[in-house]
Amino acid sequence: MVGSALGLTFASSSTLDYAAHLDRRLHDLHCSFVPGAPPTDAAEACRTAMYSPYAALFRDKYWGGIPISLFALGAFAFFAGFALYLLIAGERAPRRAVGFFALVGVTPLLVSLVMAGISATQLGSFCKTCVGIYISSFLLALGALLGAAPKGPSERPLGSWLVPAAFLPALGAVSLVPAAVYASSVPDHRPYLGLCGSLKKEPAAGDALLRMTGQRPVKPALFFEDPLCPTCRAFHQRLAAEGVLERLDVQLALFPLDSECNWMLSSAMHPGACTVSKAVICGKDRGRQVLEWAYDEQEALSRAGKLGAPTLRALIEKRWGADTLQCVDSNDTKQILNKHLHFATENGIAVSTPQVFLGKQRICDEDTDMGLRYTLRVLAPEVVR
């Protein structure tokens, strides 16, 4: 009963966070081990999980998709009700009902193990709300198995096979009901997808943008990215995971949010981003490889950037060699990065990353995270598998 109630609480928090973003705005998240804790803006791991391809189903049909927390919500509601029934019935509960509860009571734990594996291997972080669901699943499974363990002679009636035969489809139905209700109420986002403007000045050779052409490009795109921007990293990784990058012919304008080189900032949001951006430029044909290395090592590079230039430069030299550092220090590289920043200014780019254009059309910020796959399916179906 305790595990079901906790699971219901954590699944509700996760679902409410997801549904709140249907208004296309950014909201704080309930990211805490404490059930019912207030939302907070310090929830990077939970936001990473929410924006990941694993957080929802049918993302290409519904903006944001159908969050998997809805299925957990329905399942935990069923288990809470069944646990209450067993608690009230006591020794009068049929053995087959107890056995059924023990059998299906481990299923949330099995799903939690799969999701925990994805968090560890694909996301690299654990959402506290998700961990709360994992713990709840463990408590539910433990209680269900202990309740079915023999404790000597029992006076419980055997019960009919109709008990599991009836309750198994009931579990499936109750698990699906929240998702069905959610799907029926998701607003149509198509009218909003084209309201964020278009490119003012197309890239020219003199802008010296970098090229990241996929293996099967079918659509031109323009990205403004900062290699030390966590949102850029998540966006890039989502595109790569869904195979979209391989279908795009991307021109990359580096837009470091670092006042060392970016005159649009009075202070650095991402210290060291200018140096790392120059390293990406110095990668030339390997620019995408250097950018993805920066994303993979973003935490270490960000810490080094805050410690100072020598620490950051040492990390770059260790991976890419002394020649790259010489290139980073060259006046030519500085001028190229300056051209990228001027190109951003000419297009009225906000001091925020990533900024994304498909062809000439700007993709709204909110459509680059939760609504990304839906947006691509509507605006550029040829790039979605």
Please name every model-derived segment.
Residues P157-S185:
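Internal/C-terminal transmembrane anchor helices
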Residues G7, A120, R211-L239:
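Local sequence-structure signature of Cys/Sec-based thiol-disulfide redox active-site neighborhoods
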Residues F224-E225, H236-G243, P310-R385:
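C-terminal cap of thioredoxin/glutaredoxin-like
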Residues S137-L168:
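Cytosolic-side transmembrane helix boundary signature
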Residues L6, P227, R233-E317, T345:
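Structural alpha/beta surface segment adjacent to cysteine/selenocysteine redox centers
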Residues L16-D28, P108-L139, D188:
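Interfacial helix-loop-helix junctions of multi-pass membrane proteins
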Residues I66-I88, T107, V111:
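Hydrophobic alpha-helical transmembrane segments
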Residues Y18-P67:
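Extracytosolic (periplasmic/ER-lumenal) interhelical loops and adjacent juxtamembrane/interface segments
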